[in-house]
Amino acid sequence: MDIKEYFARISYGGSYEKPDLETLTEIFQHHIQAVPFENLSIHCGETIELDLAATYDKIVRKKRGGWCMENNHLLSWALKTLGYNVTLLGAKVYIPEHDAYADDIDHLLLKVVLHDKSYIVDGGFGMAYQLWQPMELISGKDQPQTPGIFRFVEENGTWYLEKVKRKQYVPNHSDSAPHNVDKEVCRRVYLFTLQPRDIEEFRARNLHLQTAPDSLFVTKSICSLQTPDGVRALVGWKLTEIKYNYKDNMDLVEIRILADEEMEKTLKEKFNITLDKKFVPINTSRLSLF
């Protein structure tokens, strides 16, 4: 594994001599705009592995994306290689339809300590709840970013991530009926503690999420990528493109339903992904991602 090959994959040509916040932010932003959050392996007959070498080969050499346990594992390797103090953490994702957090840890994120300050670095959440910058680990402080206002709230050692959303302008609204468009203002994202984790602790969950019949990732094919001004996502056959703060503190949401014959071209042109095996899209879950 070669850090310069990783930098080429994410199109990063900046300095990396000093492990400071500015460099961390630039590398992070290049990563999320180059490496999709995706679970396409599940839907084209591949297994998602947690071994770092396999993840590196998939994302860096095959120019694929991955989900949290792949993206953030690779990102942790890159940051550690550059001299950053990185700790793996585990989170439970909020499920709006159930008004509850997951029963088990199902999300991997990173804590980076810089000059006695702790930051959460999460390059593997995807969609419209993807952070665009490292977030200082401080409770109750609004931290505005391009996607919206994020904040942490800490209670008895448990940290909660929330996002304050803008209103959304959806020109072709008839194509879209996610339950939360234009309805939620503040959305819970996930909870976590500061207990250090090892990648081995995620193996059982990694297997469960790609094999359980009721898993969101089994019932939805997902590919999302952050763009310079927003995010695009292909969920099943639905292509959603969001431009943040399009006008009057509103996000522009454009939605199109694709035909089967458009999928391969869309993955290549919109996400720079070429799959080795036949991809079978699916979207049978009622759980929303926006």
From Swiss-Prot:
Reactions catalysed, semicolon-separated, are: an arylamine + acetyl-CoA = an N-acetylarylamine + CoA; an N-hydroxyarylamine + acetyl-CoA = an N-acetoxyarylamine + CoA
Q: Which Pfam families match?
A: Acetyltransf_2 (PF00797)
GO molecular function list: arylamine N-acetyltransferase activity; N-hydroxyarylamine O-acetyltransferase activity
- EC number(s) per UniProt? 2.3.1.5, 2.3.1.118
- InterPro entries associated with the record: Arylamine_N-AcTrfase, Arylamine_NAT_domain_sf, Papain-like_cys_pep_sf
SUPFAM superfamilies assigned = Cysteine proteinases
Catalytic class of the enzyme: transferase
Active site per database record? C68, H107, D122
The family database entries (Gene3D superfamilies) matched by this protein are listed as: 3.30.2140.20
Asked if the keyword Metal-binding belongs to this entry, the reply reads no
N-terminal signal peptide: none
Family (UniProt): Belongs to the arylamine N-acetyltransferase family.
Report the function annotation for this chain: Catalyzes the N- or O-acetylation of various arylamine and heterocyclic amine substrates, and participates in the detoxification of a plethora of hydrazine and arylamine drugs.
- The protein, known as: Arylamine N-acetyltransferase, pineal gland isozyme NAT-3
Q: Which species? A: Gallus gallus (Chicken)
Instruction: Provide the taxonomic classification.
Output: Eukaryota, Metazoa, Chordata, Craniata, Vertebrata
